[in-house]
Regions:
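Residues at the starts of beta-strands that form the adenosine-phosphate
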Residues: 26-28, 59, 126, 167
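N-terminal subdomain of nucleotide-sugar transferases
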Residues: 1-56
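Membrane-proximal helix-turn-helix segments that form the acceptor-binding/catalytic region
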Residues: 16, 111-114, 118-126, 149-168
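An aromatic- and histidine-rich active-site surface loop
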Residues: 10, 76-91, 99-132, 136
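A short, charged, and often flexible helix/loop element on the N-terminal side
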Residues: 56-88, 143-146, 150
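Alpha-helix capping/helix-boundary segments
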Residues: 35, 174-176
Length: 176
């Protein structure tokens, strides 16, 4: 599983990982440092990071990334830092671990797909991408990005990611 957000952050992927382990699957989660939603690293994680190395029988591999903090620039740096950490450090930490499938959990940002598709290439594993947010449409709809050039660039990035996935799952029929 590749997800920028994971336990102790409260996301649906936590339930899926628990269920997959209960069904007998060996699950490894590649994720970042827990800091959502407040934008600062969880105190419990800072005090004892090793306590967060497993979750319900799944191995949790965390890569360094900047906390979200406040403001748009800080958020973009948070997204970019997970791409770098997940794309460079992630494969090193997962060296020697085979993968049958790479499952991507994407509530936002779509950039979580970059380290996943790179890891899929390295591991020669299919990539399944669960899109819970539409990019670049969401950026335009909520007014975060108004530049047509930036939206077009994000659209190219989305196509790059989706075209390298074996399967893209939409949250609802409206996504299709």
């Amino acid at each position: 599983v590749v997800s920028q957000y994971f336990w102790p952050e409260n996301f649906r992927i936590n339930d899926l990982v628990k269920e997959w382990v209960q069904r007998g699957h060996e699950v490894t989660v590649l994720t970042g440092i827990p800091n959502y939603p407040a934008g600062k690293v969880f105190d419990a994680y800072q005090a004892q990071p090793s306590a967060f190395a497993t979750y319900e029988g799944a191995e949790v591999v965390r890569v360094p990334m900047l906390p979200r903090g406040r403001g748009g620039l800080r958020l973009m740096l948070n997204y970019l830092s997970f791409v770098v950490g997940g794309g460079v450090i992630g494969p090193l930490r997962l060296r020697g671990k085979p993968a049958d499938v790479i499952f991507v959990f994407e509530p936002s940002p779509v950039t979580v797909g970059l380290p996943a598709v790179w890891l899929g290439k390295i591991k020669n594993a299919p990539v399944v991408f669960w899109a819970l947010d539409l990019w670049p449409e969401t950026l335009a709809a909520i007014g975060v990005v108004r530049s047509h050039r930036v939206l077009a660039w994000v659209g190219h990035l989305v196509r790059y990611i989706y075209n390298r996935c074996t399967l893209v799952l939409g949250q609802s029929r409206g996504f299709l």
